[in-house]
Structures are given as C-alpha cells and as structure tokens.
Amino acid sequence: MCIRDSKDIFVLVRTSNPSSSELQELELASGERVYEHVADLVEGWGAETIGANGYSRVGAVVGATHPEEGKALRARMPHTFFLVPGYGAQGGTAQGVAGMFDKDGMGALVNSSRGIIGAWKKSGKYSESMSADDALDLVAESAREAAKDMRDNLRAVLP
C-alpha cells in the first residue's frame, strides 16, 4: 500500500496511555510480548520501502512513557521512523526519549500536545478578568516558551 499509493503509515506499537499494557504487554506463545511482535512486523513491512535516508515508509508509534522499551524497540526497528507521544504532560522526558533516536539523533518525532497547548495553565498569569486579547497573547507566549523548552531539552540529550 505504501509503495502503490505513495503514502506513509504509522502503526501503534507501544503506546503512551496507562492502559496500553493490558494488550501490548501480553506474552505470546513464543515468549515475546505483543508489542515486540508488532515491532518485528512493522520493520518487516517497511523493508521494501527503505529510502535514501535509511528509514522506511512504515513508522511506529512508541510512547515516551516507556523509555526502556523505546530504547529496545529502536534496536529492534533500526529502519523505522518513530512517532513519540506522551512527552511532557504524560510524563515523558527528553532523557527518556533519547534512546528512541538513532546514533545521529534522527529517526523520531516527539509530540507534546497537552504540554504545549496547556502551558498557559502553568504560567500562573491567567486571570478571568483578562481581556480576550491578553488571554490569547498569554496562550501564544506560553505555548511558544514550552515549545522552545522542549526543543532545548531534546537538543541537550541528542548528539
């Protein structure tokens, strides 16, 4: 499908939500966990689509809240691009996601939706008496600062 339709796809492998272990950590008859088996499938499915950058068109969703599994999955899926949710508000950290990148600091896209969108709540500057324009400015500035902090924290742990 990726080749035929010139599209990319991301497959849920090890997600960041707290209940993910109910399914993803189940042990199969082979002794593997479900997420490990899915990782092998993803790497195999993408084998025919590896481009000049060394990555396939079949990516994996690997949650920032599972840093040890993420590091092991990077070794298991060296040609797979990772989409990494769960950074920030869900507890994922720059140090924790560092192992999900390749040796050159590539191969992963880290997402922090709530941490950036909701940064204004942590600012302590919001007041119900603010004008709408001031509130929008606060939201924008807080989001900008949260994004910069995330960028700086990731840069500090990547090559």
Residues covered by each model-derived region:
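A C-terminal functional module that forms or caps the active site or interfaces directly
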Residues: 60, 64-111, 115-125
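A short glycine-/small-residue-rich loop at the edge of a beta-strand within enzyme catalytic domains
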Residues: 26-33, 60-64, 134, 141
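Surface-exposed amphipathic alpha-helices with a cationic face
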Residues: 42-47, 73-77, 151, 155
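C-terminal helical cap(s) of enzyme catalytic domains, especially alpha/beta-barrels
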Residues: 97-103, 118-159
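Short, low-complexity, polar/charged sequence segments that are solvent-exposed and flexible
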Residues: 5-6, 28-33, 79-82, 101-104, ...
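Conserved anion-binding
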Residues: 4-58
